[in-house]
């Protein structure tokens, strides 16, 4: 709500026409009120679901009626996500039956999903409980993780009592395509490399071995395993550009590109970073169709408001925060650093932007993971440009195997040639990470930092960059005095 009001009131302030200023201010207040009311209602609904989950005492038998909205495989088991319309549990000799009617998300752990399809209504009995909480500091906290996604109850030992006949045809096609694509990736790229490709293309991280995940995390390149702005930009904007040249129409190519990206997001699970990138891409495409240039801060602000309205708990999710921190890093410190270091050299420009993103995301990385990969700036400079090659080649291999399964299945040479560039790049990634880990101070263990320290860092970073930019055109002595005062204030705040 604040983002929307800030944007529209800012536009109103810049408008020279008094009548337009009044209209924009009124519009901004109306939007603020509508968004605040919607957010409050969603927040109340989430609080009610959380209170319902708190009444669960360990594992309790219960029943659910609802609709399946996502099916995902995790190792040998399946995770079925349901929008429950009715939940009941308890009712033993000394227990009171608890009944809840209202839409809420429930996660079901199942061994077989052959009878289930996306969009299907079902009635089932199961053992209900809350997600497991962390016993030790630093341990994965499933309860907190799923609460950020609006899930407070999980079900096990499922017994399906009734299944509806209607289901989502599009959802089922996307589910089958995802499963088939995963099988192709495993058969072509092997188990180790295939797990990385599935994470990058399908959003499936369940198969990544612990060593690979730790190697990428310790070197600050684990973001390539999540479907984010890089992936959406590569796929969506490339598709938009190709279709625009083929059709000659901004409108037709925009509609087709947006449709493909939305379907791709649904197929891969609609992670927070994926949704953010999708919304920003849609705004960018609409802007180009209308002949206007998109603004990164406006697009990011709109995406954050939409996501927070749909799921208020997502603002506490680490992936959500890191995703928007990276965008804000490019928009704020990135633009300021470009003014400080004006250059036409693409390598230097990319290095400056990587530094800006690292400055923006670094405090959050330290806050959540208690360590900072020192050489991630330089590793990302080498690794990110090759992501597009992995994506295009992998999509090409999957498409070829889907279109010509009979021809390519028996032709091992063609499959090996198609997979070679991807396997080579992933081998280079691993080797670069291993070399970086041999350098001194490759990963700095910082321990826990407070929220106040992060806020002070961001304020100091932006303040220093603004003062440095002004130093190029203002009185240097005055700027130096301001910088000394700013540094003294930061040190005093940190000491307190």
Kindly give the residue locations of the regions a language model identified.
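Short acidic/histidine-centered micro-motifs embedded in hydrophobic/aromatic stretches
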Residues: 199, 203, 258, 424
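Membrane-interface helix/helix-cap signal primarily in integral membrane proteins
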Residues: 33, 37-223
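Non-globular, low-confidence helical/coil segments that flank catalytic cores
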Residues: 66, 88-92, 112-127, 138, ...
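Divalent metal-coordination and catalytic microenvironments
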Residues: 66, 126, 200, 228, ...
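N-terminal leader/targeting segments
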Residues: 1-52, 276, 467-480
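Short amphipathic alpha-helical coupling elements at transmembrane boundaries
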Residues: 183, 214, 244, 261, ...
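Hydrophobic alpha-helical transmembrane segments in multi-pass membrane proteins
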Residues: 2-10, 210-377, 393, 449-496
């Amino acid at each position: 709500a604040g983002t929307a009001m800030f944007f529209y009131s800012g536009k109103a302030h810049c408008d020279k026409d008094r009548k337009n200023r009044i209209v924009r201010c009124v519009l901004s207040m109306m939007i603020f009120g509508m968004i605040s009311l919607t957010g409050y209602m969603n927040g109340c609904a989430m609080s009610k679901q959380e209170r319902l989950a708190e009444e669960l005492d360990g594992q309790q038998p219960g029943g659910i009626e609802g609709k399946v909205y996502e099916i995902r495989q995790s190792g040998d088991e399946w995770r079925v996500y349901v929008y429950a319309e009715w939940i009941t549990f308890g009712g033993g000799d000394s227990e009171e039956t608890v009944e809840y009617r209202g839409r809420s998300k429930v996660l079901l752990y199942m061994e077989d999903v052959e009878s289930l399809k996306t969009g299907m209504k079902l009635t089932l009995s199961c053992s209900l409980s809350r997600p497991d909480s962390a016993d030790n500091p630093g341990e994965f906290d499933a309860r907190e993780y799923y609460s950020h996604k609006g899930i407070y109850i999980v079900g096990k030992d499922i017994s399906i009592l009734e299944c509806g006949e209607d289901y989502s045809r599009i959802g089922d096609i996307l589910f089958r395509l995802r499963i088939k694509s995963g099988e192709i990736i495993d058969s072509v790229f092997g188990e180790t490399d295939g797990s990385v490709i599935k994470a990058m293309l399908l959003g499936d991280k369940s198969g990544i071995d612990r060593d690979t995940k730790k190697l990428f995390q310790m070197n600050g390149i684990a973001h390539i395993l999540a479907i984010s702005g890089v992936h959406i930009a590569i796929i969506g904007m490339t598709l938009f550009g190709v279709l625009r040249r083929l059709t000659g129409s901004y409108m037709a190519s925009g509609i087709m590109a947006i449709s493909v990206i939305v379907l791709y997001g649904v197929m891969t699970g609609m992670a927070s970073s994926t949704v953010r990138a999708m919304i920003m891409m849609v705004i960018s495409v609409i802007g180009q169709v209308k002949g206007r240039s998109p603004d990164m801060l406006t697009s990011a602000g709109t995406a954050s408001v939409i996501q927070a309205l749909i799921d208020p708990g997502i603002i506490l999710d680490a992936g959500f925060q890191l995703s928007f921190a990276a965008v804000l890093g490019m928009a704020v410190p990135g633009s300021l650093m470009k003014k400080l270091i004006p250059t036409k050299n693409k390598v230097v420009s990319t290095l400056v932007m990587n530094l800006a993103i690292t400055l923006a995301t670094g405090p959050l990385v330290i806050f959540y993971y208690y360590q900072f990969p020192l050489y991630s700036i330089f590793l990302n400079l080498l690794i990110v440009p090759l992501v597009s090659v992995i994506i295009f080649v992998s999509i090409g291999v999957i498409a070829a195997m889907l279109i010509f399964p009979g021809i390519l299945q028996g032709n091992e040479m063609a499959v090996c040639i198609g997979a070679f560039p991807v396997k080579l790049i992933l081998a280079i990634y691993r080797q670069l990470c291993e070399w970086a880990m041999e350098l001194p101070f490759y990963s700095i263990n910082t321990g826990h930092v407070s929220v106040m320290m992060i806020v002070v860092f961001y304020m100091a970073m932006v303040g220093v960059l603004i003062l440095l930019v002004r130093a190029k055109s203002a009185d240097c002595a005055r700027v130096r005095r301001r910088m000394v005062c700013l540094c003294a204030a930061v040190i005093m705040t940190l000491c307190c």
